[in-house]
Amino acid sequence: MPMSLRLHNNLTRRVEPFTPLDPSSPTLYVCGPTVYNYAHIGNARGPVVFDVLAALLRRRYGALRYARNITDVDDKINAAAQAQGVPISTITDRFAAIYRQDMAALGVVPPDIEPEATAHIPQIVAMIEQLIANGHAYAAEGHVLFSVSSFEDYGKLSRRDPDEMLAGARVDVAPYKRDPGDFVLWKPSSDELPGWESPWGRGRPGWHIECSAMAAAHLGPTIDIHAGGVDLQFPHHENEIAQSECAHGGATFARFWLHNGMLNFSGAKMSKSLGNIETVHDLIAKHPPEALRYALLSAHYRQPLDWSDGLIEQATNTLDRLYGTLRDLAALEACGSSGVEVSKTIPVEVESALQDDLNTPLALSVIASIASEARALRNELVHGGEPSARMSELHAVRAKLLGAGLALGLLQQDPAAWFSRGTDADDDARITALVQERSAAKKAKDFARADAIRKQLADEGIVLEDTPQGVRWKRA
């Protein structure tokens, strides 16, 4: 019997056992990007964390319907398109493609469904019409607004009191609103802005209704898990609940709500508005993408994460050690001439950590323990052991380490590829040739030439390591 999967449900503020409505087809919806610019590294935390969750759900239930949307109509997109004098699709197509490339570099598996708002205008209009028919929305001056007072449970996710929210609303409330807290479902578009025909005139949808309509279109009126950044909890997720439950006769919109914490940079939340962002696109050009993924998983997903160059360096050094261990184990297995493919099995300790509300720090500590076990075995065999006599142990510990990494989307590269990062194939061959020349020079006792080659490589940022299995090299 599999262990219980327990997740922190922000709706109840408790860690609870999770069982999907349909165990043969769990559903997961994650709020995706608004594609008007490069994603910053804080935007990547959710996709990476919930990528681990999606993989866990697939292992546990054998299937998953996972949707992550693309917001491709928005006032920020409109502003960017107007500034450049191009259609919004020029902006959105470009940055959606870059986003997908950046997420792929971080090892994020694409969702099963990636709905775009502009492809769901009929569903959005239909949901708005249903809300009007149900008495939860009203048309005014070309706008359609959701009536917050019509939904008694408004505020149940964020635990905000509706009266206090209304008291704190802006003083200059739009005159077409019945109440200050009412929010836009549809807004009119001028000729220079993108728009679609609707019963209320030419216009475009509000942000919140887009997610409600897309989630319902692809996953149904009730989904098992809705996830996103904690900054979206209010008003976005609160408004999604109100719209969806009022449109579907009170049916629960999402049974579990998961929110990842924010990234901090020098003590402040990382955000475009504060100007303290680092984009994923820039970071993957400077650092190993796998190290960025490791760093994003190094703290529990619900906690804030202090982002720094030191964190990236620490993650890179840790992966150096782990890949070095895998490389040494593979070399020892080669000595035994086994030729047997390693079967990756996820250790129960790692699976248990992830089943406990995605405890990735604990899972990473288990990986470190397995690597220590592997290095101890390696040292024992190097210093007097016989690899061929203990091939089953070598297989088992390497499979365990690879399986542990697999659960987190780590350690799946060939170690040679990891250590040759930042070089192309021709450069790899050149460096390998120099390493071989140095070994030959040492054998011939031409130590001056050997030292000169080591210095040349060091100047290029190449570190050499003499091991019982031969000379290894890696980028510093």
From Swiss-Prot:
Binding site for ATP: K272
Cofactor: Zn(2+)
Catalytic activity field: tRNA(Cys) + L-cysteine + ATP = L-cysteinyl-tRNA(Cys) + AMP + diphosphate
EC number: 6.1.1.16
Record keywords: Aminoacyl-tRNA synthetase, ATP-binding, Cytoplasm, Ligase, Metal-binding, Nucleotide-binding, Protein biosynthesis, Zinc
Subunit structure as annotated in this protein's UniProt entry: Monomer.
UniProt-recorded name of the protein: Cysteine--tRNA ligase
